Design a protein with these regions (language model features):
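Acidic catalytic/metal-coordinating carboxylates
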Residues: 79-80, 106-110
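Acidic, metal-coordinating helix/loop segments flanking the phosphotransfer/catalytic sites
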Residues: 77-95
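Alpha4 helix (beta4-alpha4-beta5 surface) of REC/receiver domains from two-component response regulators
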Residues: 109, 130-145
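Non-catalytic signal-transmission and effector/linker regions of two-component phosphorelay proteins
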Residues: 1-52, 58-65, 86, 116, ...
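Conserved phosphotransfer cores of two-component systems
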Residues: 87-91, 113-121, 141
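Receiver (REC) domain active-site loop signature in two-component systems and cognate sites
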Residues: 102
Length: 167
């Protein structure tokens, strides 16, 4: 139903025309909103470096991205190396926070694979394993950090900032 508003007698109200205008206006606004959101995403990815977390522990995957976002980073999390490798995030990631022990492809295995694809990608390992041999191998293969869980947030944030600054 069309609401009638007072108008002068020289103009007429064409409901078909108004309905089509409303549809076109709605489509235009939806398009403008989509373009704005896309533009914001593009700007966000330029202004906010993507830090990716790969860890099989759900609590880490939930908490670390939230922490990173609070401090101005864009963040994504993956439950496995395989999931990360098949995502669009590999080429966009500017710093990788990586668990050492995961089912399937381990953190050290993923590090070796990424060195072939993205040799400059800084990797910070986080682990519950107090194994000096693993730490030594990770650092020898180019890791920029090796932190024990539970990770202290200020230490992790400093490691991320240093990794991004140096790369």
């Amino acid at each position: 139903m069309v609401r009638c508003v007072p108008h002068d007698s020289s103009s007429t109200l064409n409901t078909d025309s108004n309905d089509h205008t409303l549809v076109r206006l709605t489509a235009y606004l939806q398009g403008a909103h989509s373009s704005l959101m896309e533009s914001n995403r593009d700007r966000e990815s330029i202004e906010r470096p993507l830090v990716t977390v790969v860890d099989d522990d759900v609590s880490v995957r939930e908490s670390l991205p939230n922490l990173l976002r609070q401090f101005g980073f864009s963040a994504h999390a993956f439950s496995s190396a395989e999931e990360f490798l098949t995502s669009d995030c590999v080429s966009q990631t500017r710093c990788l926070i990586l668990d050492v022990v995961m089912p399937g492809v381990t953190g050290l295995d993923l590090q070796r694979q990424l060195k072939l694809r993205s040799p400059a990608l800084p990797i910070i390992f986080i682990t519950g394993q107090k194994d000096e041999g693993i730490r030594k191998r990770a650092l020898e293969q180019g890791a920029v950090g090796f932190l024990l869980k539970p990770v202290i947030s200020t230490v992790l944030l400093e490691a991320v900032n240093v990794a991004l600054r140096e790369n």
